[in-house]
Regions:
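N-proximal low-complexity "stem/linker" segments adjacent to membrane-targeting elements
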Residues: 2-41
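Acidic donor-binding segment of Leloir-type glycosyltransferases
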Residues: 46-87
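A short, glycine-/small-residue-rich helix N-cap motif at loop->alpha-helix starts
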Residues: 92-100
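Active-site nucleotide-sugar/metal-binding loop of Leloir-type enzymes
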Residues: 102-114
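Short beta-strand-to-loop acidic/aromatic patch adjacent to the donor-nucleotide binding site
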Residues: 113-123
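Conserved donor NDP-sugar-binding/catalytic core segment of glycosyltransferases
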Residues: 129-161
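Short glycine- and hydrophobic/aromatic-rich loop-to-beta-strand nucleating segment
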Residues: 171-175
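Conserved small/polar residues in nucleotide/adenosyl-binding loops
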Residues: 178-183
Length: 183
């Protein structure tokens, strides 16, 4: 008996194809080179085409932190071994997490309409990057969508077995749009 598909092998091949991640991915790191390596190793599986990196400067009162920061920056510059655009923003002095992240996001959004933000301790699988990219495109003109986040604070399933939902609560790890930075 013939299968549903004339050529089952072509269906499998199509399922194995990955949608390229073309939305810029911003990786924000600080003083955890080993954790950053894990983050980049996971991103390597997705091979985003446009990578941005930001790193704060060492704190003056933390002896030896400048060497750790140099190592983090080396990881950012040398562990990306797939073809992609690479952009770097490094603070010469420490500005703190809030300022560094805000400035880095503004920097990327000054050059791009969309952004996916990944902090160094986020291990973002391809499924999240693809989801984020698809949602950015889908909701780009929705004025009631301020951010897209991979977050689940409740163990209960979503109604109707939905894959995602709208919430009145934001979560800081997310993606965003240029036009919303003004709000």
């Amino acid at each position: 008996m013939a299968g549903i598909f004339e050529d089952d092998k072509s269906v499998v091949r199509d399922m194995e194809k990955k949608t390229p991640i073309v939305v810029p991915v911003l990786v924000i790191g600080f003083n955890r080179p080993d954790i950053l390596r894990q983050c980049i190793a996971k991103l390597r599986e997705s091979k985003p085409q446009n990578m941005y990196f930001a790193c704060d400067g060492a704190r003056a009162d933390k002896e030896g932190e400048d060497a750790v920061i140099r190592e983090v920056r080396s990881v950012m510059e040398n562990d990306i071994d797939w073809p992609c655009e690479k952009h770097y923003r490094y603070n010469e002095r420490n500005k703190g997490c809030e300022v560094t992240e805000s400035e880095a996001i503004s920097w990327v959004l000054s050059e791009n309409e969309y952004i996916i933000v990944v902090e160094d301790d986020i291990i973002a699988p391809y499924s999240f990057l693809k989801f984020a990219q698809e949602m950015l495109y889908l909701y780009k003109d929705a004025e009631n969508v301020y951010m897209i986040s991979s977050n689940n604070q409740t163990p209960m399933p979503l109604p109707n077995n939905e894959d995602y939902c709208f919430s009145n609560y934001g979560h800081i790890w997310a993606v965003s749009y240029t036009h919303l930075r003004a709000h």
